[in-house]
């Protein structure tokens, strides 16, 4: 008889403990009901990136002096700089400049150390493609400025994200 009573007491204690845990979880769930939704309907809603966002690199061909500083400071030696030495003026002439964004880690060293400021980071972050070879941008593709998200009337921009309010 005594083991049966202790068994019922253990069962009762376990039931109360389980009810307490369920109540705690329910209270956490209720505390989240008055928060803004975190989910963003991506193609139709886009977050405005911060001022220091590291997006696609923009390249200005006319400013580049082919010094290859960007290649030396890149942790993966990514930018490909082809140049030719002009013997009559003893100066380098840039022939081709390309970056493969499938490999780029967007560290920003090339932009930071460029002596002529011919490289800059843009707010563009959409690189979705079916072929990875399309991510290899030459100087013509790097020279195009991305369309601003703010100016696109088909996209609803979200200025204040719930994540930035909490942090």
Swiss-Prot record:
Pfam family, one: Fer4_9
Residues that, per the record, bind [4Fe-4S] cluster 1: 64, 67, 70, 114
Named cofactor requirement(s): [4Fe-4S] cluster
Enzyme class: translocase
Reactions the enzyme catalyzes: a plastoquinone + NADH + (n+1) H(+)(in) = a plastoquinol + NAD(+) + n H(+)(out); a plastoquinone + NADPH + (n+1) H(+)(in) = a plastoquinol + NADP(+) + n H(+)(out)
Keyword Membrane: yes
Listed GO biological process terms: photosynthesis, light reaction
GO terms for cellular component: chloroplast thylakoid membrane
Coiled-coil boundaries: none
EC number(s) from the headed UniProt entry: 7.1.1.-
Keywords, comma-separated and alphabetical: 4Fe-4S, Chloroplast, Iron, Iron-sulfur, Membrane, Metal-binding, NAD, NADP, Plastid, Plastoquinone, Quinone, Repeat, Thylakoid, Translocase
GO molecular function: 4 iron, 4 sulfur cluster binding; iron ion binding; NADH dehydrogenase (ubiquinone) activity; quinone binding
Subunit structure and binding partners: NDH is composed of at least 16 different subunits, 5 of which are encoded in the nucleus.
Listed name of the protein: NAD(P)H-quinone oxidoreductase subunit I, chloroplastic
Origin organism lineage: Eukaryota, Viridiplantae, Streptophyta, Embryophyta, Tracheophyta
């Amino acid at each position: 008889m005594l083991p049966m009573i202790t068994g019922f007491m253990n069962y009762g204690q376990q039931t109360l403990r389980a009810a307490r845990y369920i109540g705690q979880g329910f209270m956490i769930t209720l505390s989240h009901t008055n928060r803004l939704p975190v989910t963003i309907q991506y193609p139709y809603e886009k977050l405005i990136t911060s001022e220091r966002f590291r997006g696609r690199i923009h390249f200005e061909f006319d400013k580049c002096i082919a010094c290859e500083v960007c290649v030396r400071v890149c942790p993966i030696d990514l930018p490909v700089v082809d140049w030719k030495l002009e013997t009559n003026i003893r100066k380098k002439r840039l022939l081709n400049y390309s970056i493969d964004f499938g490999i780029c880690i967007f560290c920003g060293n090339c932009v930071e150390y460029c002596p002529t400021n011919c490289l800059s980071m843009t707010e563009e972050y959409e690189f979705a493609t079916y072929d990875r070879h399309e991510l290899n941008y030459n100087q013509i593709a790097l020279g195009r400025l991305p369309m601003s998200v703010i100016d696109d009337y088909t996209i609803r921009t979200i200025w204040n994200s719930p994540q930035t309010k909490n942090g």
